[in-house]
Amino acid sequence: LAAGQNHPSFGMRIKNPTPSLDDRYYVEHSNQHVGQGCLSGSENSAAIGGWRFTGLKLCRATALSESISKDLLPFLTSIQPKRMSDSYDTIIIGAGMSGLAAGIRLAHFDQRVCILERHYTIGGLNSFYRMGGRDYDVGLHAMTNYARKGTKKGPLAKLIRQLRFSWEDFKLAEQIGSSIRFPGVELDFNNDIELLESEIQKNFPTQIDGFRNLCDSLLDYSDMDGDDPRFMQSAREVVSSHITDRLLVEMLICPLMWYGNAREDDMDFGQFCIMFRACYLEGFGRPYKGVRVILKNLVKRFRGLGGELKLRSGVSKIHTDRGVATGVVLDDGTELEGKRILSSAGSIETLRLCDDVTQPEVAKAGKLSFIESISVLDRQPSDFDFDRTIVFYNDSDTFHWKRPEDQLCDARTGVICSPNNYIYDSEEGKLPDGVIRITTLANHDRWCALPENKYRAAKIEQYDASVASSVRFMPDFRRYVIDTDVFTPKTIRRFTWHDNGAVYGAPDKQLDGTTHLPNVFLCGTDQGFVGIVGAIVSGISMANRHCLVGN
């Protein structure tokens, strides 16, 4: 059939809006999209949208797959429910930051790459949505590892170089300044370590030499493969060997656990070093338009290099044969073949997908999950004398980093973030609304066990509790609130698929990204790097290490 020609029997119309893209065709029936692909097939057997049927001369889809219109079904002489198979150099599970970054890196080297995402949107936990006429960011308090334009070293410079972005593609604004607030004492810090040093000199004068010694003992990023024997040491023990004041130890470790620790109570020293550099030595930044500009740039680059992104395409199984992965099966039955698989789904979650694993060790899953209470204000936070970018607070001298077992949430400690309090360019101006975001620890199982009516009521109750806790450490903003939203561990579970809604994944990281299968690898939180920059660097590093060998 020629473009635009109607099928003489069934009224089928073929359109070709983009003939330059491999002569890819869209096919419609009764003005409903049926599928797309390259024109092919025979008089008696053809396929479109991944569905094979006989008696029609149609086209074979090679990219996006759509369900066949119900209006079309009566006209088909027969349908075989088995989906057609496509083959890729690398299949990536998850369109979060790490998956997208890995896809870009591989597509640069002309690999045929397909990213599969279960949901209707990209980003995983670091995403965004629109509600009530307002845009909301999810996950992005700040991008850690801030670096100024032209910097040659560090994770941010690495990702810009390896993904071939420019500094203007992210255009990060620096934080105004953040604080660690415990009862009776406060430490301010910004993107210059000298401020934190001066704060420690002022509040803990006997500890300043110990703090400097701690800085000198940090593992370098080049040591983050886990081979250094100090990597798995207790962070509390190592820090306490340099700093003898227990309160200062608790204060320094608080932000680092909040922004990147999957282990309860303590932290691997290697992970402590990663987060210490990310938060204290490099600092925080944010694009004016938030996480959406980061995701937009990643997707645009990936697709521009020929990568395939399939949304609403969850993976139900990883096929194995003789100890090697051969491909995946999607939730709708589509089979895709791949030479290798890179998964950001999590270590336990990935093992569960493999058809050669009967029961992964679910006890190793992470337990730490959060709720986040978002308040939209009728004024800027600076209007009521709140200029902090982020406040990490704790209401006692001991920092408790553990899932609350007997309640929905633990509001004794939390994080207050205002995206308004960054140094944006004058041409960008101020954000349209004042926003305060408050994060507290939560129990995934208790939230998920609530019936719908009690779940909605609990969101209101816990919003009130988290705000009431936070205003002990910042000016009271409750009379300025004009809109709210709350996301819970149930939300996190839905959009990340992590067991227990674990924000930072499993406590035991697989730093080399390997699994029990020689061609299935991990990237993202369970590989070891967390946060936006960490996730992107994880995707790049695992792609370089495992997927470009011999390329």
Question: Where in the sequence are the language-model features?
Answer:
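N-terminal glycine-rich phosphate/pyrophosphate-binding loop and immediately adjacent elements
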Residues: 83-209
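Rossmann-like flavin
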Residues: 182-267
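A conserved FAD-binding loop/helix module that cradles the flavin
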Residues: 525-546
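C-terminal segments that line or cap access tunnels to active or ligand-binding sites in enzymes
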Residues: 379-487
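Helical element adjacent to the flavin cofactor pocket in flavoenzyme catalytic cores
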Residues: 275-325
